[in-house]
Amino acid sequence: MLNATSAEVLAEPAQVGAVVAAALDRAGPGLTGQRRITETFRSSGVSGELINALVSSEPATRASAARLCGALRLSEAVIWIEDLLQDKDPTVRDAAVRALAELGGRRAIEALMGSVNRISLHRLAIALARGATDIDIEALMRQPGSEKAATVTVLACGLRRDALRVAPLLGIAHDRRWPVQVRIAACRSLGMIGDPSAVGGLDVLAEKDPDAGIKKAAAQAWRRLQGPKRLRPA
């Protein structure tokens, strides 16, 4: 039984969120442990009050509620948290992005990508890297909604250190039908992933691609894969 009111929980979102995160880690990756933890909040009525707090007139309360709904993986809160992506208060918007990343799932990812033009590129890439499944990433790479959506998805692959995406990323980096910024992002992600199988493809781009930005990004990724002892000649 939870011995705390929603007001007490909302007053300490960081501390409560940390406790919940630690409990979820101990429970393991399965849904059983997660449900056991969230049920404690549901049975006490606190989870419902947290969702109601998402529409509070106080920005600090909305932000705290979003953070806690994310920490508790309250999937029924996604539709309300999505609205907070357009909140006037930047702290609330940031809390909403973080919450959706923690929640994950198709609806949360759709909400994030639906706000691709309102969230900074790198902030969205971090959220996507955290919240998206492999299936989500594959679908977004196959049919990105815009150049920025493609760039964000490609960067998320690098942030996830997703070695399974090396071949597709090399394909994007070499394919001049893709916008330059997406190709540059692919080079950067290959550098972040650090898989040596990308060295040859990056070497070709660094030497022969006609675009200076691509050459620079490929050379930087190449050097990162080679390590500090081998520097590419100018």
Predicted regions and their residues:
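Acidic, Ser/Thr-rich low-complexity segments on the non-lumenal side of membrane proteins
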Residues: M1-R26
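Extended alpha-helical scaffolding segments
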Residues: P59, C69, R183-E207, D211
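Membrane-embedded segments
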Residues: P59-R73, K88-R98
